[in-house]
């Protein structure tokens, strides 16, 4: 009997099977909430570490702001509150008494952080002010799906203030490219289209939204991260101004940007196969699992010795010698969890001075001399990383179709992405597509670049797809 539903038979059911069998997450007691299990959280911690290092390299520093936000704060930016109102969780009672003013459970933090950007920004010398926080947020979700859409999720949100529009725009673009795109291509091994959102899809209160869009294994799009230029909308609402070098007061220009645990769902759907997860080595909490074939003292001792050598080589290694579990069961567990490389240690191989290396992505088995394990495994991990990216890129290229009409785009987007000149779609065509549950995922320049904010050049193209 198959452990997992086949992806080709029922992709949504397969996704749920992987969540359960790989021990990634479970449903929480309140509809729309989730429990992230230790292995799922270990993957998220690896994502955090990689993204956080890139955020810090871009000059931002971490801080933390309150979970509860006065309702009046949200009302100070009209478009923002209108965009989030249907998703808000509002607290009206505290300590057994009705609150004088209801407080909103953080859906995003532009408003509360805006209050403190105003407090901390006095002079042009204080700018740019570049902040980030790792937190949980609540957006009441009517159609929850673990990691993809949940009422509470974990994320990072960056918020910055700048002295001029050009600096703010350049920084928002830098985050989209040097933080998000770099992480997704270099670590997550998911190729992404980076472009701007249409006015219809733009973040509430933003003047421009940049997005990273990945193609999942079923051809649907997943928004992996966004970076927003907020213009002076929030600066005006929260009095974020400063004394300029010219001696006059000026409003600041602000940005916000974020990615979330939704990326764990993207990892599953972009790389998973009928045997479970396939985790890229640069991301994997455990890059190598060493499996003794038999529960014999000499075999287990050699497995631990090999693991120690691989750990000394800088790899993340686990020995699975759990008593009472067959070798086959331990292999299945390693496959479902997507550990990139297995080192199988058996008495016959040891007698010949070898072990067997097994790639999770291809199931290819290679006998390797014991003396070469510590040098061969890192090379193999590099090959797995590159091949997973190449496979995802090949899928995207094979399922992205250039079309010339909105009707053709609607047909092509049933199986993948449709690419079409934006001038042939426009807001009218976008509304037509919405009736068929299709969206314009992003607008790009002809060479796949990010257009300048507000550009209406005739040669812009857009990507249309079904989405999560």
From Swiss-Prot:
Cellular localisation: Cytoplasm
Function statement: Catalyzes the attachment of proline to tRNA(Pro) in a two-step reaction: proline is first activated by ATP to form Pro-AMP and then transferred to the acceptor end of tRNA(Pro).
Domain characteristics, as noted in the entry: Consists of three domains: the N-terminal catalytic domain, the anticodon-binding domain and the C-terminal extension.
Superkingdom classification of source: Bacteria
Stated family: Belongs to the class-II aminoacyl-tRNA synthetase family. ProS type 3 subfamily.
Catalytic activity: tRNA(Pro) + L-proline + ATP = L-prolyl-tRNA(Pro) + AMP + diphosphate
Keywords per UniProt: Aminoacyl-tRNA synthetase, ATP-binding, Cytoplasm, Ligase, Nucleotide-binding, Protein biosynthesis
Subunit structure: Homodimer.
EC id: 6.1.1.15
GO terms for cellular component: aminoacyl-tRNA synthetase multienzyme complex; cytoplasm
Entry's transmembrane regions: none
Primary localization: cytoplasm
InterPro entries: aa-tRNA-synt_IIb, aa-tRNA-synth_II, aa-tRNA-synth_II/BPL/LPL, Anticodon-bd, Anticodon-bd_dom_sf, Pro-tRNA-ligase_IIa, Pro-tRNA-ligase_IIa_arc-type, Pro-tRNA_ligase_II_C
One BP annotation, GO: prolyl-tRNA aminoacylation
Coiled coil (residue ranges): none
Protein name in the entry: Proline--tRNA ligase
UniProt key word Aminoacyl-tRNA synthetase: yes
GO MF term set: ATP binding; proline-tRNA ligase activity
């Amino acid at each position: 009997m198959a452990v997992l539903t086949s992806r080709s038979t029922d992709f949504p059911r397969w996704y749920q099977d992987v969540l359960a069998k790989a021990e990634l997450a479970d449903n929480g007691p309140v509809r729309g909430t989730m429990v992230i299990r230790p292995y799922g959280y270990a993957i998220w911690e690896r994502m955090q570490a990689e993204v956080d290092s890139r955020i810090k390299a871009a000059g931002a520093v971490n801080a933390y702001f309150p979970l509860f936000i006065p309702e009046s704060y949200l009302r100070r930016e009209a478009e923002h509150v209108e965009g989030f109102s249907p998703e808000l969780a509002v607290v009206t009672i505290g300590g057994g008494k009705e609150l004088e003013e209801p407080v909103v459970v953080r859906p995003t933090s532009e408003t509360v952080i805006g209050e403190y950007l105003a407090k901390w920004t006095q002079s042009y010398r204080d700018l740019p002010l570049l902040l980030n926080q790792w937190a949980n947020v609540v957006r009441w979700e009517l159609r929850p799906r673990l990691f993809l859409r949940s009422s509470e999720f974990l994320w990072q949100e960056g918020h910055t203030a700048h002295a001029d529009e050009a600096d703010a725009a350049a920084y928002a673009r830098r985050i989209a490219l040097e933080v998000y795109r770099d992480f997704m291509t270099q670590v997550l091994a998911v190729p992404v289209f980076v472009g701007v959102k249409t006015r219809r899809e733009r973040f509430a209160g933003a003047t421009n939204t940049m997005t990273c869009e990945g193609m999942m294994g079923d051809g649907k799009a997943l928004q992996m991260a966004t970076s927003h230029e907020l213009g002076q909308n929030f600066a005006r609402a929260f009095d974020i101004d400063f004394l300029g070098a010219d001696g006059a007061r000026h409003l600041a220009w602000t940005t916000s940007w974020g990615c979330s645990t939704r990326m764990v769902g993207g990892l599953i759907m972009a790389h998973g196969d009928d045997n479970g997860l396939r985790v890229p080595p640069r991301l994997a909490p455990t890059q190598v699992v060493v499996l003794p074939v038999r529960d014999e003292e000499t075999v287990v001792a050699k497995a631990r010795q090999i693991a120690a050598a691989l750990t000394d080589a800088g790899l993340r290694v686990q020995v699975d010698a759990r008593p009472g579990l067959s070798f086959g069961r331990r292999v299945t567990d390693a496959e479902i969890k997507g550990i990139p490389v297995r080192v199988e240690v058996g008495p016959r191989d040891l007698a010949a001075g070898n072990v067997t290396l097994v790639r999770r992505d291809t199931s290819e088995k290679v006998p390797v001399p014991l003396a070469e394990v510590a040098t061969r495994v890192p090379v193999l991990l590099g090959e797995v990383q590159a091949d997973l990216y190449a496979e995802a890129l090949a899928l995207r290229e094979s399922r992205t179709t250039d079309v010339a009409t909105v009707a053709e785009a609607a047909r092509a987007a049933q199986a993948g992405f449709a690419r079409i000149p934006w001038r042939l779609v426009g807001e009218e065509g976008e509304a037509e597509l919405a009736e068929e549950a299709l969206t314009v995922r992003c607008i790009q320049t002809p060479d796949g670049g990010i257009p300048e904010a507000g550009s209406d050049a005739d040669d812009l193209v857009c990507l249309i797809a079904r989405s999560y």
